[in-house]
Amino acid sequence: MAAKRVLIVLGKLKRGGAETLVMNIYRTIDRSVVQFDFVVHTPDRYDYDDEIESLGGKIYRFPQYNVLNHFEYKRCWNRFFAEHPEYRIIHAHMTGSASVFLPIAKKYGLVTIAHSHIA
């Protein structure tokens, strides 16, 4: 049986708090059962890109959300979910744009998790 793929949404794959937390979990999970794939909001490669790819994870790059690209951003997510029915779970670590993409994910039947790291 193939591993369940969970889509993790972050801003960048830098060595920040949320990113490091996710990577610590990712390194220790049984990736034959659960596999993390990532959506990031930058065209640039950062600290964890190579490690994620070496662990079998995919990285998808989205535009950074702002009010001026609201409708384009929504189209990107709709297109993504239409083209990737393999994802059943999305775990968002972004507070600002989660209100845009989580309802779209829900529309496509995904289980949604919104995780805030702001203290």
Provide a role label for each language-model segment.
Residues 6, 89, 105-119:
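Active-site proximal beta-strand in glycosyltransferases
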